[in-house]
Amino acid sequence: MLKEFQEFISKGNVMDLAVGVIIGAAFGKIVDSLVNDIIMPIIGAIFGGLDFNNYFVGLSSAVNATSLADARKQGAVLAYGSFITVALNFVILAFIIFLMVKAVNNLRKRLEREKPAAAAPPPADIALLTQIRDLLARK
């Protein structure tokens, strides 16, 4: 049973999937940093220096805090700023993955075009004439 498991794990598809998941997780952190540390501060500066992560609406009258963390302690909040940030992360990640898939597909198409096409077999009459010629040449 252990040997079967080892064979299963060592197959190319499983290893490729594992590498893809690990790289995907690391890439997700890069996109999070890009959005949180570069894009959102620029957008915040354009809209008055505000941090989108602190945009929220209190869902009860008891919520009167100015920061999201304090507001969550006071009661239920609708944290739409955090949602905007996460949605932007998703859009950027989806676009980058789209570009990567498109590049791989273009590379595959280019490699298929560069492969020489297999020579079509000659028509039956040409093959027969070639055989006759070869037989006559041997005599």
Curated annotation (Swiss-Prot):
The record's GO CC annotations read: plasma membrane
On assembly, the entry states: Homopentamer.
Name of the protein this chain belongs to: Large-conductance mechanosensitive channel 1
Report the gene name.
mscL1
InterPro entries linked to this entry: Mechanosensitive_channel_CS, MS_channel, MSC/AndL, MscL_channel
Please describe what this protein does.
Channel that opens in response to stretch forces in the membrane lipid bilayer. May participate in the regulation of osmotic pressure changes within the cell.
Where is this gene product found? Answer: Cell inner membrane
- One GO molecular-function entry: mechanosensitive monoatomic ion channel activity
Entry keywords, A to Z: Cell inner membrane, Cell membrane, Ion channel, Ion transport, Membrane, Transmembrane, Transmembrane helix, Transport
